[in-house]
Amino acid sequence: MRVPGEASMKIINHALYNDDDTPVPFKRTPNQGRNGQDVEISPSLLVMQYTAGGNLAGAVSWFSNPEAKASAHVVVGRDGEVAQCALFNRRAWHAGGGMWRGRADINSWSIGIEMVNWGKLTKVAGTWRTDTQATYAGHEGDPAVDVLEAPHFNTPGGAILGWPTYTETQLAKVNEVAQAIVAQYGITEIIGHEDFRTDKWDPGPAFPLSSFRSRVLGREEGGGTFDR
């Protein structure tokens, strides 16, 4: 097993490459920069988010739509597939408003990783519903198998919500992507969208942010699965 801190993926000219030197599929998003102009950034923060959707192709298509007014640098699917939508030294539109450690305009100094996941679910008449009120059938066909029931610190009253779990394959690939980014740009801090936006829930309780952060930043030894 790969030692934490050693990235098997790599970054060349701010584009992501696999360990066999093949480039990750790149679909440039029009939703980047500012006022129609590209903006170069020096990233020092990594932001973890979910797509609120069920597949990678849908997320990439959405980020390719100018009407979306949203994007991320890279998307990681449930089967470990990866697509890049913006070079890592370009300002993507993934963070929105909010501040972190007294700094605003987080898009201008961070890299955003989106993971394919439906995100927050609400139970209505015994059925899990997505934020669009669509019935959640479960990634494995049975929502009882892959939904974590837990509160979220941004939800008043501690209401219990549903959170589709991330696959181990997906988590392993996100780990590789994040380690490559950290190695290239010297990033020392990884947070969730939820950490600086009280109206956001991603990546949510199903994502093992604490152990993921430790592993990516080289603060945790050993292998095994990610602790939730």
What does each model-identified segment do?
Residues 1-107:
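N-terminal catalytic cores of peptidoglycan-degrading enzymes
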Residues 2-20, 39-40, 116-228:
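Basic/polar, cationic surfaces and motifs that engage anionic cell-wall
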Residues 45, 110, 189:
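Hydrophobic "anchor" residues on beta-strands that sit immediately upstream
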Residues 105-110, 124-127:
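Conserved, surface-exposed functional patches that form binding/active-site neighborhoods
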